[in-house]
């Protein structure tokens, strides 16, 4: 976990949760843009499964005081969907090119329902047992599948930092979704080669998103390639949370 604290006049703390095949550095450009205005926490997502990942995030949230905006990238959306129900301090969710499953739904279910993404064919399993494996993106496939709008050097850095996700994380069913009770925002690119646009659109509308932003030509690596769009979405959520409540006196 990395934490950057500021005197933020009771603004919400922004907790950033990375997805599979990456680490917290995916958020670096976002952190640079927000650190002067918000207390930021970059969570270390274990990538071991829906339950352990959500439990890890929920434990971190218990150490955070005041209102929280949970921001998930890619598979990190599964973690915020589940952990968001475990803390009364979570006030909003932001899905950045992210998965937002329903109860009993897995990431694999979503990909099966909306085929067309290239991620599944790009995965290389490293068996842990007869039934379990760590999943990696095959060498040389990162740029095209995850980060096509990044320069090659940036995509190579992303690949060098790749962290595997446990196979059970993608097949495990989700719990009660926090997006059913919390305001939520979605931002994603229309050139995401790993998550089909139809899936992004479906999730955002199913969740009743306050706002949906689609970034032209953007890949899955939105926090790196389009950090301004991500930050604008987070700021929009924060503004809604900090609007004064009118004092209405009954007649």
What label would you give each PLM region?
Residues 9-50, 68, 89:
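Conserved HGGG/HGGXW glycine-rich cap/lid loop of the alpha/beta-hydrolase fold
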Residues 223-239:
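Post-His helix in hydrolase/transferase enzymes
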Residues 214, 218-227, 248-249:
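Catalytic histidine-centered segment of alpha/beta-hydrolase-like enzymes
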Residues 39-69, 83-85, 106-112:
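Active-site loop/oxyanion-hole signature of alpha/beta-hydrolase fold enzymes
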Residues 85, 89-90, 94-130, 166-170:
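Flexible "cap/lid" loop of the alpha/beta hydrolase fold
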């Amino acid at each position: 976990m990395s934490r950057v604290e500021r005197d933020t006049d009771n603004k919400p703390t922004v907790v950033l949760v990375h997805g599979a095949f990456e680490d917290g550095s995916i958020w670096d450009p976002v952190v640079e843009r927000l650190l002067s205005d918000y207390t930021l926490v970059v969570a270390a997502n274990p990538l071991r499964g829906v339950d352990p990942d959500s439990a890890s995030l929920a434990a971190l949230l218990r150490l955070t005081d005041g209102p929280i905006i949970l921001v998930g990238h890619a598979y990190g959306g599964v973690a915020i969907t589940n952990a968001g129900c475990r803390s009364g301090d979570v006030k909003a969710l932001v899905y950045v090119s992210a998965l937002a499953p329903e109860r009993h739904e897995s990431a694999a279910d979503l990909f099966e329902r909306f085929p067309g993404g290239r991620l599944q064919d790009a995965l290389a399993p490293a068996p842990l047992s007869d039934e379990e494996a760590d999943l990696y993106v095959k060498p040389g496939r990162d740029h095209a599948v995850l980060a096509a709008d990044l320069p090659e050097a940036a995509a190579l850095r992303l690949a060098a930092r790749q962290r595997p996700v446990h196979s059970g994380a993608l097949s495990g069913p989700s719990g009660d979704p926090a997006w059913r009770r919390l305001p939520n925002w979605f931002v994603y690119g229309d050139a995401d080669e790993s998550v089909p646009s139809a899936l992004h659109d479906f999730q955002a509308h199913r969740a009743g998103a306050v706002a949906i932003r689609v970034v032209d030509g953007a890949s899955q690596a939105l926090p790196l390639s389009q950090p301004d769009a991500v930050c604008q979405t987070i700021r929009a959520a924060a503004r809604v949370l900090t609007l004064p409540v009118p004092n209405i006196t009954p007649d």
